[in-house]
Regions:
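Acidic/polar hotspots within intrinsically disordered regions
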Residues: 6-7, 15, 23-25
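Low-complexity intrinsically disordered segments
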Residues: 8, 17-19, 31
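Nucleotide-activated sugar donor-binding and catalytic core shared by glycosyltransferases
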Residues: 15-16, 156
Length: 197
């Protein structure tokens, strides 16, 4: 992160208390944390399970900001992370509906406590003339990795929470961004908070 972003910022937890953490920490920091929920879902790794979960959101008009899914340490079980905005009441409704699906084993709202969140972004940027040194400088500031180099481009890999990735994109001249892909967020509870069978 740029040095100016290391100022202490308040963090709100689900219990309504707030603490101060530095922006550089990997604890999720969001302006409306209570409205942005990260749901972690264990479900059976079967054909159609993903489409039924997504269909539930669509049928009831719930929005999905990001979605990631992959097998867990048990290959018969997948873990899905859904980021969805909504009031606590709406998220409670979503959780109840998800728990009614046969394939769903367990649902946890990670935003009800402390958790770590990460997202991966690959961005191809123009790197010619003065832009080349500027892109290298920004990559270093945001602790990225240059994973591909040509005489005209850099491909940069960045990981962090969505605020960090958004801050990088704002720092780069839009005309320099040639292509970008993001994975969506995944999260895990801190300390003894675990989601398993």
């Amino acid at each position: 992160y740029p040095v100016s972003l290391h100022d202490a910022l308040p963090i709100c937890l689900a219990d309504g208390k707030s603490r101060t953490r530095t922006y550089g920490n990997d604890l999720r920091l969001g302006e409306n944390l209570m409205n942005r929920h990260v749901l972690s879902i264990l479900l059976e790794n079967e054909p159609g399970a993903l489409s039924r979960v997504v269909g539930l959101f669509s049928a009831r008009g719930y929005n999905i900001e990001s979605l990631t899914v992959a097998p867990t340490e048990d290959p018969t079980v997948s873990r899905m992370t859904i980021v969805s905005p909504g009031s606590p009441e709406i998220i409670e409704q979503i959780t109840k509906h998800l728990n009614r699906l046969i394939e769903v084993i367990k649902v946890v709202d990670l935003t009800e406590g402390e958790y770590a969140e990460r997202e991966l972004m690959l961005v191809k940027v123009r790197a010619v003339g003065k832009d080349r040194e500027e892109m290298k400088r920004l990559n270093d500031i945001f602790r990225g990795r240059i994973i591909d180099v040509t005489d005209k481009t850099y491909t940069i890999e960045l990981t962090g929470n969505s605020d960090k990735l958004d801050a990088f994109l704002k720092a780069v001249d839009k005309e320099c961004i040639l292509e970008m892909v993001r994975t969506g967020s995944c999260g895990i509870g801190r300390g003894d908070r675990m989601l398993h069978l």
